[in-house]
């Protein structure tokens, strides 16, 4: 069962849709992100898993309340909820784009119908239903990707070796520059970003924590974290290889790709126009599986947070089992509906991925720093955490928004020069260091 629970951690609609497009357009620099995941999963298994299982709470943020007060728990869980809503919206939107290309359905209708289906089965079975459904969908997803890659490779006139020849000649397997620049996506920038965002995912993301807590033992929970981390490398490599193979395929047969079909749209176009009907259906199922499993997990875990951190603490402090179930159902529906509206809002952005990164940087950039401040520094106080969070939020907002609003005039001098992926890195470090320095410099007078 733990292996099945890890399937969702290794595949998602973002990896399925974005990775092939990224490899097609550029190279394997983004694959460095995958290489960082085993590092984060190691720390999760060694430190975070036993820690959370010892707390005995379904919320990942009860520790923050114990260390710094109720505000810290509310802050962290609010950041989590905002991040999940943004994540759901971006995935629903990304999911609708290829389905629109594949079947010609209206994007808004795809978003609405998919969301209703996800809300329904999330409500019917709770977390266990999501875990088992994700396992089935995950196998379909991986199987569909492998089949698609094989078809691509063997469609080449000179066989699979031709894909590698073209890719090597055009440097499509490059992992990026090994220079020290912090303004572009070098190997090191991608690796550092991956370590921090995955430490946050494995360390305090409620999606992962729920899986630690549903394991029968510490050993199983640790295995789940490690297995999922290491599984992601070969799985993501398949998706990057699909993008590289697409590049080689359409370079060999340029007449098969219409003008205007670029980036993320190339893979869906290949599915529709180059695969047999049966395989096309399998890939359609895989794409839907990716989005539905990811969004369902976000809805279920978000509803749990609302129940434990808000409803049972501030609205109804002693809810009956029936009231708790009703609160979960209502939360599922509300979160799902909000996700629909966020997805519709993405219709107006130039790049869904850019918008998702900006939102995730703002909403999740400081949670890891706050957690580490309380986890590592036993003497850190409430005031230290508050000062740290304030400083961290300022840095995160500056790095995320200044490049957008400080484009022209003298204000351009104050725009962040750093790559956007480093936002969570600086935000986390600033919160931790500011809180730690506050603890050392602003000692309580006795």
What does each model-identified segment do?
Residues 1-4, 8-446:
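Membrane-embedded helix-loop-helix hairpins and adjacent transmembrane boundary segments
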């Amino acid at each position: 069962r733990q292996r099945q629970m890890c399937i969702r951690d290794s595949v998602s609609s973002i990896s399925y849709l974005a990775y092939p497009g990224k490899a097609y357009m550029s190279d394997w620099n983004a694959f460095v992100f995958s290489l960082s995941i085993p590092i984060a999963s190691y720390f999760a298994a060694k430190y975070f898993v036993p820690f959370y299982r010892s707390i005995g709470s379904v919320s990942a943020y009860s520790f923050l309340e114990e260390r710094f007060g109720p505000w810290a728990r509310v802050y962290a869980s609010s950041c989590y909820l905002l991040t999940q809503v943004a994540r759901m919206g971006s995935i629903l939107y990304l999911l609708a784009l290829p389905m629109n290309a594949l079947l010609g359905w209206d994007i808004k209708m795809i978003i609405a119908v998919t969301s209703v289906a996800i809300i329904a089965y999330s409500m019917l079975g709770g977390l266990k239903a999501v875990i088992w459904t994700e396992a089935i969908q995950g196998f379909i997803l991986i199987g569909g990707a492998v089949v698609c890659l094989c078809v691509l490779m063997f469609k080449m006139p000179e066989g699979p070796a031709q894909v590698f020849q073209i890719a090597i000649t055009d440097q499509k397997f490059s992992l990026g520059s090994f220079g020290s620049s912090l303004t572009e996506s070098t190997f090191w920038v991608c690796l550092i970003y991956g370590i921090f965002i995955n430490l946050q995912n494995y360390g305090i993301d409620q999606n992962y924590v729920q899986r630690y807590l549903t394991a029968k033992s510490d050993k199983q929970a640790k295995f789940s974290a490690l297995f999922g981390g290491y599984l992601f490398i070969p799985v993501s490599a398949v998706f990057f290889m699909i993008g590289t193979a697409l590049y080689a395929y359409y370079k060999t047969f340029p007449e098969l790709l219409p003008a205007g079909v670029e980036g993320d749209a190339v893979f869906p176009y290949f599915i529709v126009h180059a695969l047999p009907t049966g395989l096309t259906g399998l890939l359609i199922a895989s794409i839907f599986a990716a989005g539905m499993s990811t969004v369902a997990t976000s809805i279920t875990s978000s509803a749990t947070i609302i129940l434990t951190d808000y409803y049972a603490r501030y609205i109804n402090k002693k809810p009956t089992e029936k009231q708790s179930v009703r609160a979960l159902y209502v939360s599922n529906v509300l979160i799902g509906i909000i996700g629909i509206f966020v997805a519709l809002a993405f219709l107006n952005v130039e790049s869904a991925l850019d918008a998702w990164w900006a939102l995730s940087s703002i909403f999740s950039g400081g949670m890891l720093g706050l957690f580490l401040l309380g986890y590592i520094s036993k003497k850190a106080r409430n005031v230290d955490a508050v000062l740290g969070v304030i400083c961290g939020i300022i840095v995160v907002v500056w790095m995320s928004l200044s490049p957008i609003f400080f484009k022209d005039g003298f204000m351009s001098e104050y725009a962040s020069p750093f790559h956007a992926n480093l936002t969570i890195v600086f935000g986390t470090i600033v919160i931790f260091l500011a809180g730690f320095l506050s603890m050392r410099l602003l000692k309580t007078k006795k």
